[in-house]
C-alpha cells in the first residue's frame, strides 16, 4: 500500500511541475499549435510591491523596433523615492539596456525573433509600493515580416505605390499615438503629484490652525492666572 501511495504522489508532483513550467515559460508550446505572439502594442498601469520585480514578455520578429516607456505615477507608502529600475533582455536572457529614473524609455532594434523580456525593479523602496504606467510594443519599418509573403502574388506598380503610401501614413499615425501615450503618462503623473500636494497643504494648514488656537488658549489661561488672587479674612489684595 505504501509503495502505491508513493508512486501516486510522484505522479501528482510531476503533473504540477509540468503545469507550472507551462505557465511561466512564454516560449513553451506544442508543435502542433501555432505560437501565441500577443499584441504589438500594450499600455496599462501596474503596482510594483516593495523590493519586487515585475516582468513582461513582448514578441518581436527580426529587423523590428521595440520600444519600452514607463512613468512613475505615485508612491503608496512611507518612502518618497520615486525612482524605479527598468531593464530589457534578449530572448536568450542577455541584458540589452537599463534605465533608472522616474520616467524613461528604452528603444532598440530587434536582432532576433522571440520573446523579449521587459522588467521593472522596485529595489530602492523597501516599505513602499510604486504605481507605474507602462507603454511598450513593437513596430516594423518597411515591409512587414511575414512568412507567407513569399507565397503571395506580386502586385502591379500602382497597387505597390498605394501600399507603400498607406504604410508610411500608418507608421506616422503610430508614432503620433506613441507620443500621445507618453504625454498622457506625464499628465497622469502630474495629476497625482498635484493631488498629493493638495492633501499635504490641507493637513499642514489644519495643523497650523490648531497650533495657533491652542497657543492662544494657553496664553489666555496664564494671563488669567496672573491677575487672579485668592482672598481671605487675613489676606486681602493690595492696590
UniProtKB/Swiss-Prot annotation:
Membrane topology: Single-pass type I membrane protein
Lumenal side stretches: 22-200
Predominant subcellular localization, coarse grouping: endoplasmic reticulum
Subcellular location: Endoplasmic reticulum membrane
Superkingdom per UniProt: Eukaryota
Signal peptide start and end residues: 1-21
GO cellular component: endoplasmic reticulum membrane
Family stated for the protein in its record: Belongs to the EMP24/GP25L family.
Protein name, UniProt field: Transmembrane emp24 domain-containing protein 6
Lineage, broadest ranks: Eukaryota, Metazoa, Chordata, Craniata, Vertebrata
This protein's encoding gene: Tmed6
Amino acid at each position: 500500500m505504501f509503495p502505491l501511495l508513493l508512486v501516486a504522489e510522484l505522479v501528482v508532483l510531476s503533473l504540477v511541475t509540468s503545469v507550472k513550467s507551462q505557465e511561466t515559460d512564454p516560449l513553451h508550446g506544442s508543435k502542433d499549435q501555432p505560437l501565441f505572439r500577443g499584441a504589438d502594442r500594450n499600455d496599462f498601469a501596474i503596482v510594483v510591491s516593495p523590493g519586487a520585480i515585475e516582468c513582461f514578455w513582448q514578441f518581436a520578429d527580426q529587423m523590428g523596433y521595440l520600444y519600452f516607456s514607463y512613468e512613475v505615477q505615485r508612491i503608496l507608502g512611507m518612502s518618497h523615492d520615486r525612482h524605479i529600475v527598468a531593464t530589457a533582455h534578449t530572448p536568450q536572457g542577455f541584458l540589452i539596456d537599463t534605465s533608472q529614473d522616474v520616467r524613461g524609455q528604452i528603444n532598440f532594434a530587434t536582432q532576433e525573433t522571440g520573446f523579449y523580456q521587459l522588467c521593472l525593479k522596485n529595489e530602492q523602496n523597501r516599505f513602499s509600493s510604486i504605481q507605474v504606467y507602462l507603454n511598450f510594443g513593437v513596430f516594423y519599418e518597411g515591409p512587414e515580416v511575414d512568412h507567407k509573403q513569399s507565397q503571395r502574388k506580386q502586385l502591379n506598380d500602382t497597387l505597390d505605390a498605394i501600399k507603400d503610401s498607406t504604410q508610411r501614413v500608418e507608421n506616422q499615425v503610430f508614432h503620433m499615438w506613441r507620443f500621445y501615450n507618453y504625454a498622457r503618462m506625464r499628465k497622469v503623473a502630474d495629476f497625482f503629484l498635484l493631488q498629493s500636494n493638495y492633501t499635504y497643504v490641507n493637513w499642514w494648514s489644519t495643523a497650523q490652525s490648531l497650533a495657533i488656537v491652542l497657543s492662544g488658549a494657553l496664553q489666555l489661561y496664564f494671563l488669567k492666572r496672573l491677575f487672579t488672587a485668592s482672598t481671605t479674612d487675613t489676606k486681602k489684595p493690595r492696590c
